[in-house]
Amino acid sequence: MKLPEKLGPIHFIGIGGIGMSGIAEVMANLGYTVQGSDANDNANVRRLSENGIRTFVGHRAENVENAALVVVSTAIRRDNPELIEARERRLPVVRRAEMLAELMRFKSCVAVAGTHGKTTTTSLVATLLDAGNLDPTVINGGIINAYGTNARMGAGDWMVVEADESDGTFLKLPADVAIVTNIDPEHLDHFGSFDAIKDAFRRFIDNIPFYGFAVMCIDHPIVQDLVGHIEDRRIITYGENPQADVRLIDIDLKGGQSRFRVMIRDRRPGFRLEMQDLVLPMPGRHNALNATAALAVAHELGVSEDAIRKALAGFGGVKRRFTRTGEWNGAAIFDDYGHHPVEIAAVLRAARSSTDGKVIAVVQPHRYTRLQSLFEDFCTCFNDADTVIVAPVYAAGEAPIEGIDRDSLIAGLKARGHRDAVALERPEDLARLVSGRAEPNDYVVCLGAGTITQWAYALPGELAALKG
């Protein structure tokens, strides 16, 4: 039995979230009656409202009065008034991943998982399949610039989704094709141990059907080890590793883009295909790897080399993934979602390879628990930044942890040899700190998953006003 086509209103609690908004948008496009609420009036809420979806700002019990079904994200607490009301009314309450899984049953599906790179890789897979006239439905964890949204309804047989592993619910997703970009210690508050995380990814791959396949990055040692523990499923490996089935070769990172070639070697004797002079208009070795994963899927699904080449060259990127917000005095300013040490290091490495000037990092640490559990990694992931400006921790609802804060991170950076790590007391002080350091050709990179994105977009104007 599949999700009935005729349901009463489906109410999303937290509809403005990046994952929830995409599901809501696709369901509305499928003809379901969709509504929802969010604590804040954000861009996603406004976009859904403009598309005819009824939205409420603020959570109130009366918002679910006419609902037949309620969808919740993991961010919604048990004491939410709408959730309490839904349960008092005995309404079905569905987790976000469960509803995504229901949508996936309508299509053949590619699910993109991994600690880092999911959103960009999902966007790249969607772009390449679109170029191959497969017209996929897409539900992503970020705004795809070419679409202006994180979701689109396609008429083709394929769906491409970002598989969020943070609460383990990605194991509910019925994928035909699975991508694993990397596996690092993250979300330990849910999983309890790194071994539990690795086991979850193994089960994610085991879930694909015998006629499907997994695309896995063997440059990452944990993923390479996982490949050795997968039985009875088809695996396509990718990476710079000489043993990879889809091998990334000769990366040239200059001028804010990546040039490379890819060699595809099937396990069939004698099969070999080389794609020369590929161009991706994004900097960074990590993005070239993401493109290689997408290329592996597209090639397997029959997309031509010419379509792949043109789609990569025309890729418009993803919002909050090394997004240029403006410039001042010849220095470029960027916004990036990176908030894990591995992500931060990759972004700063990409920035370093793209400019002859200095790299100035502005970071807003996200969650006390993350800073605590990965403290040593945070203290060493800024090596490619000439200056690190550290803001107070964005708590995301957490209580402070003694000895884990902005100042302890600055002390840790300096203790490990960083030459210029400074504190940001207030967002209003950022322009002054940057203006005293930024010169022509420098990159100012704002990093974090909290409110720092607002600072990144405001900074060019604030610098201009300061100069005046």
Swiss-Prot record:
Pathway as given in its UniProt record: Cell wall biogenesis; peptidoglycan biosynthesis
EC number assigned by the record: 6.3.2.8
EC top class, as a word: ligase
InterPro entries reported in the protein's UniProt record: Mur-like_cat_sf, Mur_ligase_C, Mur_ligase_C_dom_sf, Mur_ligase_cen, Mur_ligase_N, MurCDEF_pg_biosynth, UDP-N-AcMur_Ala_ligase_MurC
Gene Ontology BP term (one): cell wall organization
Keyword vocabulary terms for this entry: ATP-binding, Cell cycle, Cell division, Cell shape, Cell wall biogenesis/degradation, Cytoplasm, Ligase, Nucleotide-binding, Peptidoglycan synthesis
Keyword Secreted: no
Keyword Methyltransferase: no
Pfam families in alphabetical order: Mur_ligase, Mur_ligase_C, Mur_ligase_M
Main location: cytoplasm
One GO CC term, this protein: cytoplasm
GO MF assignments: ATP binding; UDP-N-acetylmuramate-L-alanine ligase activity
Catalytic activity: UDP-N-acetyl-alpha-D-muramate + L-alanine + ATP = UDP-N-acetyl-alpha-D-muramoyl-L-alanine + ADP + phosphate + H(+)
Family affiliation: Belongs to the MurCDEF family.
Annotated protein name in UniProt: UDP-N-acetylmuramate--L-alanine ligase
Naturally occurring in which organism (per UniProt): Methylorubrum populi (strain ATCC BAA-705 / NCIMB 13946 / BJ001)
